């Protein structure tokens, strides 16, 4: 036991910044305080007049609680907005919601019944509005709990009256620019929805279907010389997986340049693509009894075949470029009312666009066969009828990828109905969009190829829906001609004004007479609603153009990778149709969340992780850190192991912050700062290192490489600070005089670093950043209004950056030798070691600059530097280490042995100068002067 207690002479660090974050419990209180103090408003005030940066929120659908994918999306947006704010931009964030459409209708129907049965259409729309509002409030609470800042009190809602009105105005502008067309055209149709579907509402799943080969007897083969001499009937064979579409067949398509052969079989003479004869006959289990003729497809154009189910119908053989010989027979069953390729080729030949199927899948009374029967029940009846009349060549089952409704997960059909379209070709919309896609920055870069391929192949956009809850297509069509009213634009503006005052109900509840007066008898008022993708796709006009704090085009659209076929595409098309330019400067996409085995999360697998449960366990900051540290460009893995990695990363950052804050607890930068040029060399070096890291972090934020941001931060905390700088300065912080130059120099450096570090983590660890900020600046100050830290200007002088790189290299080698010596029981701690370093050249020069302070860098009681030539013969062999600042190899020998002397009871260094000050017989000379003298001075470490 020391005779005197020196504890009170040490600078023991303390801070209110707790070791345990307790985020899950404390974050709600912070949120409540921030909301009460209008932090978002303070940020707007702080950036008033600055250059704008607009991230436009893609609206989530107002239905159900948020899932982990929602959390990823909103947090990524928040990181960008907060980082741009730190970069000096005025970056307002206006969240939005998509409020119309079928899922909400279904929820209301389940509770209140269908329109016309238990509720009127007007009542139904009111119930839909109310349901959407309740869902928005639930989701809003979850988004705010994530620490996402935004104008939550004034979000945009596609069901706001003024926004519904502006959606109508957007349609009017697109109509005025000549992009809206009407026609009987096959569209994606869900029998469960009883409505058309947008491309984005269709997903592909495997399905088992009936596959049949059917023969059509050619009735006028004699018109082709090569076929005229063939004895017996010739039958063209088609293949289809949708037998129910055969009643709508209007033609058989062939390719003009493919060869077709008439093959004799025990089932008669069959016409097949020459390249498919063998595979087809093998499938039919028929023998090739000889090829009777071979002709080019174009020679068969204009022949007719008897429909196998409808006696009164003969169908032509036509030519189409869509016909291939990859499989089947090379002859394609063509029903323009049930397929887009069929429809397109049908236009060329003026084929009827017959649709004998109702919206619920029942054959209409006008159908030539099977009237009143549901198409799926008719399938086996059609197959049986073909078998009975001898036209069924083969019937099998196949599993194939088939389009399904994304809501009902049920197979869709293609069905021609009168619909409104935005044409891709009439005014060159496709061409214009493709020309502008390369002008946008796509992140990741492959997003450009993806949307280009989708834009190249997409059909006209069917914008009409047969729903109750949606924005109306405010058209009036003439009862006889089908033409739109000549004053359509004026009528649409009138409708928009009324909707602005009373919502979409102002259209639906009004009569034709309310708009047209005496003309009403000649016109039909449209009852269709707009595709909800039109609602969200026109927010560049209905939101960005209408709010003073926003700008159009936006700087950034950010959504999941599925939105190349959804919101990105519909926004691009509507903007091109309205303004002839994209609505965004940059588009960023993120991957989906999967479990740790790479599986999609689903109830059936029992692997769903909700953001709510994770936040309740560890807090929103931990979830935000997982999101930021994941490479969002790919699938994002979530689970216990992955989350543990984020927890460990968080602890490293928090512990570093705690050390920095504790060691500046008594530091007043106004009175205690050391002039930047008078700092200890090590302190200058770590500030310069922090400047370098800050530049890397800001660059990574600007590039949206948030996982790189987290790596830079954690590497700086663990390597530059934890393993090097903070370890070295502990002695200086604790043992030198409280107000002495060595300690205040370190505190000055720490102050600059913690100011920067808090800002670095603010976009990601928002709660923790503000908690740390308040320790420095009080509860009335917010880091969210700050900009990136500006470090003081200075130059390294006595010891250069290259010197420090070599010194760190030597320190690493010393640490390895000390660990070996500890393992061999030569020493039991760093301070029980003396080290000799034998070096030459640049390494010797760099180490020599530290002089007597070398031991403080190495954290040993003594350190002696000697020329390499003096290394004892018994010493360890030379260690070779590559000098990172040169191309050569550095020779350095490290020798570790037990320190000789007496242990100082205050600093624990083992020295031979213990008791040289008689007033303090148990202290080393350094501690004695720090306790009762002038205090030590440090120059280098």
Curated annotation (Swiss-Prot):
Gene name of the record: ileS
Gene Ontology terms: cellular component: cytosol
Official protein name in the record: Isoleucine--tRNA ligase
Catalytic activity, EC: 6.1.1.5
Record's comment describing the protein's domains: IleRS has two distinct active sites: one for aminoacylation and one for editing. The misactivated valine is translocated from the active site to the editing site, which sterically excludes the correctly activated isoleucine. The single editing site contains two valyl binding pockets, one specific for each substrate (Val-AMP or Val-tRNA(Ile)).
Keywords recorded for this protein, A-Z: Aminoacyl-tRNA synthetase, ATP-binding, Cytoplasm, Ligase, Metal-binding, Nucleotide-binding, Protein biosynthesis, Zinc
Self-association state and partner proteins as the record states: Monomer.
Job of this protein: Catalyzes the attachment of isoleucine to tRNA(Ile). As IleRS can inadvertently accommodate and process structurally similar amino acids such as valine, to avoid such errors it has two additional distinct tRNA(Ile)-dependent editing activities. One activity is designated as 'pretransfer' editing and involves the hydrolysis of activated Val-AMP. The other activity is designated 'posttransfer' editing and involves deacylation of mischarged Val-tRNA(Ile).
Cofactor: Zn(2+)
């Amino acid at each position: 036991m020391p005779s005197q207690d020196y504890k009170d002479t040490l600078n023991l660090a303390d801070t209110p910044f707790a070791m345990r974050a307790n985020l899950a419990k404390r974050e709600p209180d912070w949120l409540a305080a921030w909301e009460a103090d209008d932090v978002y408003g303070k940020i707007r005030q702080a950036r008033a007049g600055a250059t704008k940066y607009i991230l436009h929120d893609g609206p989530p659908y107002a239905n159900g609680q948020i899932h982990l994918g929602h959390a990823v999306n909103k947090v990524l947006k928040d990181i960008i907005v907060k980082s741009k704010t730190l970069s000096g931009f005025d970056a307002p964030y206006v969240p939005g919601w998509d409020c119309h459409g079928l899922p909400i209708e279904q929820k209301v129907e389940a509770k209140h019944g269908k329109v016309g049965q238990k509720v009127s259409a007007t009542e139904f729309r009111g119930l839909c509005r109310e349901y959407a509002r309740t869902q928005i409030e639930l989701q809003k609470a979850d988004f705010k709990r994530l620490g996402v800042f935004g104008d939550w009190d004034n979000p945009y809602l596609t069901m706001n009256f003024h926004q519904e009105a502006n959606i109508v105005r957007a349609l009017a502008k697109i109509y005025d620019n000549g992009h809206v067309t009407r026609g009987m055209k096959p569209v994606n149709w869900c029998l469960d929805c009883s409505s058309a579907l947008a491309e984005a509402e269709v997903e592909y799943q495997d399905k088992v279907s009936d596959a049949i080969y059917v023969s059509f007897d050619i009735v006028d083969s004699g018109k082709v010389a090569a076929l005229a001499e063939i004895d017996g009937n010739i039958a063209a064979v088609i293949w289809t997986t949708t037998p129910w579409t055969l009643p709508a067949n209007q033609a058989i398509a062939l390719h003009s340049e493919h060869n077709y052969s008439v093959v004799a079989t025990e089932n008669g003479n069959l016409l097949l693509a020459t390249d498919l004869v063998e595979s087809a006959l093998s499938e039919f289990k028929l023998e090739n009894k000889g090829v009777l003729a071979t002709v080019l497809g174009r020679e068969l154009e204009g022949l007719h075949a008897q429909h196998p189910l409808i006696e009164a119908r003969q169908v032509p053989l036509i030519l189409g470029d869509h016909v291939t010989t990859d499989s089947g027979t090379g002859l394609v069953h063509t029903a323009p009312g049930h397929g887009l390729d069929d429809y397109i080729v049908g236009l060329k030949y003026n084929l009827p666009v017959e649709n004998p199927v109702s919206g619920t899948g029942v054959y209409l009374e006008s159908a030539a066969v099977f009237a009143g029967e549901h198409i799926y029940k008719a399938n086996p009846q059609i197959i049986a009828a073909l078998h009975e009349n001898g036209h069924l060549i083969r019937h099998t089952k196949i599993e194939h990828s088939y389009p399904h409704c994304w809501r009902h997960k049920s197979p869709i059909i293609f069905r021609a109905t009168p619909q409104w379209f935005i044409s891709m070709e009439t005014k060159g919309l496709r061409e214009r969009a493709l020309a502008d896609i390369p002008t946008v920055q796509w992140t990741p870069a492959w997003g450009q190829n993806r949307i280009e391929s989708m834009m190249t192949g997409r059909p006209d956009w069917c914008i009409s829906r047969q729903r109750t809850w949606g924005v109306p297509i405010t058209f009036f069509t003439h009862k006889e001609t089908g033409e739109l009213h000549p004053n359509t634009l004026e009528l649409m503006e009138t409708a928009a004004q009324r909707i602005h005052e009373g919502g979409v109900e102002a259209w639906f509840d009004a009569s034709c007479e309310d708009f047209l007066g005496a003309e009403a008898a000649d016109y039909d008022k449209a009852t269709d609603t707009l595709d909800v993708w039109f609602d969200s796709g026109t927010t560049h006009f209905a939101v960005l153009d209408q709010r003073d704090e926003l700008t159009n085009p936006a700087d950034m659209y950010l959504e999941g990778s599925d939105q190349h076929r959804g919101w990105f595409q519909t926004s691009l098309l509507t903007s091109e149709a309205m303004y002839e330019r994209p609505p965004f400067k940059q588009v960023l996409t993120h991957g989906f969340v999967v479990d740790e085995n790479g599986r999609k999360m689903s109830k059936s697998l029992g692997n769903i992780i909700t953001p709510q449960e994770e936040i309740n366990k560890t807090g929103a900051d931990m979830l935000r850190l997982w999101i930021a540290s994941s490479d969002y460009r790919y699938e994002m893995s979530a689970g216990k192991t992955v989350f543990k990695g984020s927890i460990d990363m968080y602890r490293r950052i928090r512990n570093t912050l705690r050390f920095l804050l504790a060691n500046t607890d008594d530091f007043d930068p106004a009175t205690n700062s050391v002039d930047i040029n008078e700092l200890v060399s090590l302190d200058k070096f770590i500030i310069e290192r922090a400047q370098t890291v800050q530049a890397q972090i800001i660059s990574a934020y600007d590039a949206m490489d948030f996982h790189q941001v987290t790596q830079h931060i954690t590497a700086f905390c663990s390597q530059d600070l934890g393993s090097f700088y903070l370890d070295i300065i502990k002695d200086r912080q604790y043992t030198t005089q409280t107000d002495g130059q060595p300690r205040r120099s370190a505190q000055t450096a720490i102050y600059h670093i913690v100011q920067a570090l808090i800002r670095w983590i603010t976009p990601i660890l928002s709660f923790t950043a503000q908690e740390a900020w308040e320790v420095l600046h009080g509860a009335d100050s917010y880091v969210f209004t700050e900009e990136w830290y500006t470090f003081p200007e200075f130059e390294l002088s006595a010891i250069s950056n290259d010197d420090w790189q070599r010194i760190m290299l030597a320190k690493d080698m010393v640490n390895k030798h000390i660990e070996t010596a500890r393992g061999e029981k030569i020493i039991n701690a760093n301070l029980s070691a003396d080290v000799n370093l034998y070096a030459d050249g640049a390494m010797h020069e760099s180490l020599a600059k530290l002089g007597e302070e070398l031991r403080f860098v190495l954290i040993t009681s003594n350190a002696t530097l000697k020329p390499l030539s003096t290394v004892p013969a018994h010493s360890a062999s030379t260690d070779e280490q590559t000098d990172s600042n040169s191309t050569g190899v550095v020779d350095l020998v490290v020798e570790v042995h037990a320190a000789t002397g007496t242990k100082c009871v205050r600093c624990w260094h083992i020295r031979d100068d213990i008791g040289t000050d008689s007033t303090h017989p148990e202290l080393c000379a350094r501690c004695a002067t720090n306790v009762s003298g002038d205090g030590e001075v440090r120059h280098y470490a």
